[in-house]
Structure formats: C-alpha cells, structure tokens
Amino acid sequence: MNVTNLPTYYQQFIHKSRYARWIESENRREEWDETISRYMAFMSAHLMEKHDYKIDNKLYHQLYEAIVKQDIMPSMRCVMTAGKALERDNTAGYNCSYLPVDDPKSFDEAMYILMCGTGVGFSVERNYVNKLPEVPEQLFRAEETIIVSDSKEGWAKALRKLLALLWSGEIPNWDLSRVRPAGSILKTFGGRASGPAPLDSLFNFIVLTFKNASGRKLSSLECHDIMCKVGEVVVSGGVRRSAMISLSNLSDDRMRHAKTGEFYKLQPQRQMSNNSVAYTEKPDMKTFMREWLSLAESGTGERGMFYRGAAQNKAQENGRRDSTWDFGTNPCSEIILRPYQFCNLSEVIVRGDDSIDDISKKVELATILGT
C-alpha cells in the first residue's frame, strides 16, 4: 500500500473532505500520511507538555505505521482537529457524548459540543424534561438585544441567553452583525462558516416553539425538535455533520410517530437525529410487537430500541461500573454512557489473514491510543 494515499477513491474523498487540513504554504490539502504525522506530532507534544512523558521512538513509529496502514484507528475527531483546534478545547477530541435534556443549559451545551465535531446522544424522557421550567403564560417583546459573538462559545452563550429570557417571559432582539459571512474560511477548525442565517433560523424557531407552549412545560417532542434544530444549524457550517440520537419513553406516542409520513418536508430538522425508545424493563410480547409494528410502518426504521436494563446488567456483570446509573448511549449506540459523559473511540481493524498474535498487537496499540 502507498502510505501517501488511501487505497480506494471513496476513502480518499472522505479523507480529503473531512480530515485533511489545508497547507497554506503549498496551496493544497494534506496527504494521508501527513494527516497522521500531524496527529502523532500533536499527541507527542501534548504528552510532553502536560505530563512530562516522552513516547519511546520505537512505540511512536509502531503507532504511526499501524494507523497509516489502517491496522488501527484513533479517535477520528482527534485526527480531524489535532493542532490549534484540539489545543484550544479537548472537547474536539472526543467522538461522542450523552446528556439528558433536564436543564435549560442542555440545549446550548449540545450546540457547543456539536460545533466541536463531537456527536451528541440525548434523552427527552419525561423524568428529564419535566425538570425544565414552565413557559410563562405570556411572552412580551423586550428591549434587550443579544449580541452574538463570532465563535462557538459566542453562539452557545447567545442560545443560553435567549432561552433564559424566554423562560422569564421576554422575547429579545438579536444582533448577528458580528458573525462572519457564509463561506468564510474557518482557519483554526477547518471548513467554511455557515454565516448568520442558520442561527437566525434557530432563534426564530425557538421563539415560535415557546409561543406555542405558553402556560405549560415544553413537551418531549418540542425539546426533541429544538435539539434537532440545533443540530441542523451546526450541520450548516464547517465540514462535520451533526451526529445525534434521541431516547424517549415507551409510552411517548408523539416521539413514536415523530418520523412518520412526510416529516422531512413538514419538520425537516427531525432528519438530524436517530430516535430510539428507552426500555427500562423487558416488555411483554404485545407491547414489543406494538412498537415493532410502529417501526415497520414508519418507513424509516424508527424508533429503534435501546434497552437500559441490559446496559445496567452489563455494567454490573463486569464489576467496573456503578450499575445504578440511568445509562444513555452515543449516536452509533455501540457504547453505554453516563449522563454528561464523553466517548473516546479507538478501532481495531481485523483482517482475514490476521493471526492471534497480530490481533493482540493491534489491540495493544489501539489501547495505547485511547488511553
């Protein structure tokens, strides 16, 4: 294999469009081996600076070769952001996260995490969304104007302020003049700016949602829609699509049918999230078949099924986790997560001609990458 590039056109396209950083001095994007060199150089410098630890030269080259040849893969968010972006905020190094929508700040935290390129799993189960404040009976136009700064932090802070004012009964104005125009180059994080229009759309969507919910609490579906709209805003900018999964109660009929019919025309933001029911105990056959029929009739294969009881049993089985947590999951649903936890994914690529020793070595190196 030519380590300068990847073996298939599809892999080359994904690398160039998602992970290769622009080299200004040479007016081109990185080749595959250069991307991994950047990742390895960053991690090596980070270990030395933060932990006074120098990677052994032999191990350094073993890790480099294994990644370049795709025997193992580190967190792909780290591969994408290694450099100034990851140095600025380690959130950008994690693949995924999970949080319940149980606090007004859940929405802006999800926005910030998504803008860092990290996937977000979230729950709109009633024991969480019922903790949110009640929307006032009336909403009044306020004189206050939210000035939105041109940064990930600025967008998230503006969203937090908008929600706080709406829950206090005020509809503010917002000033997006400081947000850079659409198409502007994002030098630190890579990609191009989405401009102010998506954020303006999000704010108007949230104001309308609050108006429709006056005098009561937001429903699970309304919380879900706001989270999905946040994801839609993030997908508009940069190069990383938002990855999201939404968990809901078995008895939540609104969420059961959230993605049926022509939802993609009427509520297009719902395309941003996979949806799954969160089982807390094994259902009887009638209950299971009712949900399964709904899944089949939706035409989208949703809602999927996440069994929290099995997650708790697995945590108890290995004795390394507190099994009493209400576990959630990441958007790919291959790992269980506690509320507000991140996921750091390393991968081992097993091939047909691998020996047991080959696989053991790959697992060892992948474990080092993820530690």
Functional labels for PLM-detected ranges:
Residues 1-371:
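Extended catalytic cores of very large enzyme megasubunits
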